[in-house]
Amino acid sequence: MYNIFIAPILNGHQFVFTMCLWYVVPLFMIEVLNILIRKILKLKIENVNEYVFFIVSLLSGMLGTYLASKGYNKGWYLFLDRILYFIPFFSLGILYNKKLEKSDKLNNTIYFTIIFLIQLLIITINGKPVTCTPSWCNFNGNVIMPFIVGTLGIAFWLRIAQILEPIVRNSRVVNIISENTFSIMVHQFLGFFAVNTIFAICSKFVPAISNFNWHRYKTDIWYYYLPNDIKQWYIIYLIAGIIVPLIISYILEKLKDKITNNLIQNNKLFNKRLDKENVV
């Protein structure tokens, strides 16, 4: 019961194959809080100023990184810190959608130059790249630095997506992947494990891979077997980490459709019987 109801809130890593779901509970809480806060504000303010809302959210996030830096990132504190850390990015997304997107017209060269120069300046001042581990709320730098580097990363990939969108928008493969990103994120480790399982079976019959580590296979989710330690084999894990989740998503969609159709059919039959009884 603890692993089902409490562990997802406190850490989200209780089931290693789906540990990528750790962020779902904090994100859900943020969406609920966002709606509640805006509902309350609208009782007093007709139009919420998104810039002010973002600044307040950023201050909340800085409180979260401060608490985490002081060691308050375990148990229920971790749950709180995750929420506080995510709030500024959630608010920034709303701010961008409502206010900033229409002004996002800067030339690509200037745009990327600004991002790279700011990032280079941060690395120079810090002495190394600033790293963050949001899942455990381990942050490098001062209380605002995680939000600066996070925003730079978002800005970079946002523009990359804008550049690629006209090129790949009609790609069937890209569309399939884009429509199943949640499944890929959730089930990627099952794909990796599937490759390891194939290697495990083959190691019984193929002498060349007899050095497969069965102990790590059974106990270490991060174990990836590379024949002759050739790093290019990682591409097989990458492909499996996409294909296996797509297969799972396809099966689940088919099951969902079948169950839905059965429920609809049963409901129609029930209504027909009810109509007959009413007539009688």
Protein language model features and the residues they cover:
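Alpha-helical transmembrane segments and their immediate juxtamembrane cytosolic regions
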Residues: 1-280
